[in-house]
Swiss-Prot record:
This is Probable cobalt-precorrin-6B C(15)-methyltransferase (decarboxylating). Its EC number is 2.1.1.196. Belongs to the methyltransferase superfamily. Archaeal-type CbiT family. Pfam families: Methyltransf_31. InterPro entries: CbiT, Cbl_synth_MTase_CbiT, Cobalamin_biosynth_MTase, Methyltranfer_dom, SAM-dependent_MTases_sf. Coiled coil: none annotated. One of its GO terms (molecular function) is cobalt-precorrin-6B C5-methyltransferase activity. S-adenosyl-L-methionine binds at residues 20, 44-48, 68, 96.
C-alpha cells in the first residue's frame, strides 16, 4: 500500500479538465479511510488524479471504478492510469447515477468530485456502499455542502464537513510568497 500525495506536476494535464489538487486529494482520501484491498468509486474522475491515488492505496487486491461523462476526461483518466501502470482500475464512460449500474460489487468508499444531480447520486451510491463505508464529496459552493449534508443526514449517515484553505509557496526574487488557493469543502458521511 502506498500513501497518497503524488505531486500535481506528475499527472498528464489538459487545461479544460479540472484536477483535484494534491493536498485536497490527500485529505479526501484520508476521509475515505481506504485500505489495502478496498473497493472504491471515483465519480467525476476528471484527470484521474483521485482514481490513480486510490488505485495505489488499495493495491493489487483492491479495485477502483472511475466514472466520467466527458469523453476527453475519460481519455485523460485512461492516460494517467496507464502512466502509473495501474491494473486495478475500471473506467466507465457515462453519467452518474446511471453509470453506477456498471459497478458489479459493493464498495468501501465513494468519492464524488462532480456535483450535478448530487441528491440522485448520493441515493444511488448508498445502494453500492457497504455498511460502515464512507462517501466523500468535494465542493466549492455552500449550496452543495448544504445539499450533501442534508441528504446524507436524511439517509441516516454520520456526517461532518471540513473547510480546507491551502496556500502554496511561490519562489520570488527575494524569497517565497504564499499564494492562496480557493477554499474547498470536504463533506463526508459514514453509512450506518
Amino acid at each position: 500500500m502506498r500513501l497518497p500525495g503524488i505531486p500535481d506536476e506528475e499527472f498528464i494535464r489538459v487545461e479544460k479538465i479540472p484536477m483535484t489538487k494534491e493536498e485536497i486529494r490527500v485529505l479526501a482520501l484520508s476521509k475515505a479511510r481506504l485500505f489495502d484491498g478496498a473497493k472504491f468509486i471515483d465519480i467525476g474522475s476528471g484527470t484521474g488524479s483521485v482514481t490513480v491515488e486510490a488505485g495505489l492505496v488499495v493495491g493489487e487486491k483492491g479495485k477502483v471504478w472511475a466514472i466520467e461523462k466527458d469523453k476527453d476526461a475519460v481519455e485523460l483518466t485512461k492516460k494517467n492510469v496507464e502512466k502509473f501502470k495501474l491494473n486495478n482500475v475500471v473506467i466507465i464512460e457515462g453519467e452518474a447515477p446511471e453509470a453506477l449500474d456498471h459497478v458489479d460489487s459493493e464498495v468501501d468508499a465513494i468519492f464524488i468530485g462532480g456535483t450535478e444531480r448530487l441528491e440522485e447520486i448520493l441515493l444511488s451510491s448508498d445502494k453500492k456502499l457497504k455498511n460502515g463505508g464512507r462517501i466523500v464529496i468535494d465542493a466549492i459552493l455552500l449550496e452543495t455542502v448544504n445539499k450533501a449534508l442534508s441528504t446524507l443526514n436524511q439517509m441516516g449517515y454520520k456526517t461532518d464537513v471540513i473547510e480546507v484553505i491551502i496556500a502554496k509557496g511561490m519562489k520570488t526574487s527575494k524569497g517565497y510568497a504564499m499564494i492562496s488557493r480557493n477554499p474547498i469543502f470536504i463533506v463526508y458521511g459514514e453509512k450506518p
